[in-house]
Structure formats: C-alpha cells, structure tokens
C-alpha cells in the first residue's frame, strides 16, 4: 500500500489511511491529522527483494527498516505524543474501543450473519448490537487473542441460533458444491475450470476490485450472478456418477422405502443438501 514510497522527506499517507479506515478502526474514529502522524511513524518501513532461491525463480520480499529514512520527530496520534514509530501506532490503535468494536463486527459479519456494507458502518448500527458488544469485550479481555474470541463466538446463543442469515460468497458456493458432490479431493483434469466458476459469479479469486475487498451479503447477488450459481450447482448435482450425489440418492431411496410424493422428494433432497430452504414460486397470500 505504497509504504515503500513513504519517506521522512515526503510522507505518503496511503498506508496510514488504509490502516485506520479498513484494517482497524473504521471511518469516523480518527482525524486527518491522525492519518498524517500515523504515516510519519511508518516512514522507513519498507521491503527489500531477496535473491531467488533457484535459477530464474521469483524474488521473495522481506521487511526492511531503513533508519535513515525514518521520521524520528515528535508526533501526536490519537492523543498520544512522543517519538512514535510503527509499533507504537499499532499499540495505540489496539487500545481504542473503536478497534475492538470494528474487529468484533467483522467477526460477526463473517461467521454469524450478513451486516450492512462496511462503508456504512459509521452511520448504521449493527443488526445485533448485544452480540457485537459481547465479542468486543472478548477482544479487549483477551488482549486480542483470537482463539479466545472465537471460542466466545462459537459458544454463543446468537451463533448457534443463526440460520439462513448469510449469503455464501462465490468461492464458498463453488467449494461447498464440489465437496458435496465429491470426487474432487485431489487435483484432476478439469479442476482448473472449476476454479474459474467463482469469477463468473462475481469473485475473481485473488483479484479483489480494491484494497477494501469485495462487498458481501446481498451484493453478491444480481440477475447474472444468480443464474451462474444455479447453473453451476445444477450441473454438478445432475452428475449421478459423483460419489456425493450417489450417496444422497441412496439415502433418499432408504427413506420410507423410497416412496415419495413430488413435494416430499424435493423437501428430502433439500434437507440432505444443506439443509436448503426454498419458497414456493407463488406463496399463498
């Protein structure tokens, strides 16, 4: 994020801004002066290429601190004044309640239920403020030990009771479907084409549209991406030679002697697939 172009004599604010806006506190919890002072503290933090480990190999990169390029003057950041460097900035950021809340809301959004898009968080409260508060407290109490925080999350009632509250990302759709149908445990001809399917659904793997990443939840779905999802899943589930599909068919055949009405067959199949919930095309009024 351009910190290699962040020098004591010419401060580049890109990394400082992204650190505060996207990766720790969120918009509205710092000032423009904080962005500049944060960026000053990270001057001299850069990357250095290493010699390739093999002929014509890729150049790895490693962190390098160039003391002569570091601004060692006094800085004031979020109310703290001193000869601050990048490590001090991280400590100060992690001591802010806004950071704990930001991390907690991201965890809730990833594991429990879709939240509004991140840029709106400054003005839009969480869907479940109590859950986010519980996670934020766990972040602070554990001093950012994510194992402890996730234990609180996974043991909570709001996590256990969450169902049909998240729209899968394209990567989750593709990987989950391939796991369900089976036969893709090891690399095989055609697996590369399967990996492209997420891109057709709107998530070009390892190529997010910006440093912010992808917008999730309902923004995964539009008329084109929905068709891609349905067609991909239908094609995989129609291949009765796949071990996972065969297992679903066998389990259905073993239920009630394999005798179902059309409605019962669809319901039983959906239960074995997820469960998956669908609505009637024309629900009763």
Residue spans for each PLM region:
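Non-catalytic, conformational "gating/processing" segments within enzyme and secreted inhibitor domains
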Residues: 1-124
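Flexible, low-complexity segments enriched for small/polar residues
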Residues: 96, 100, 104-142, 150-285
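Acidic/polar loop patches that form or flank catalytic/metal-binding clefts of enzymes
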Residues: 31, 50, 146-150, 161-162
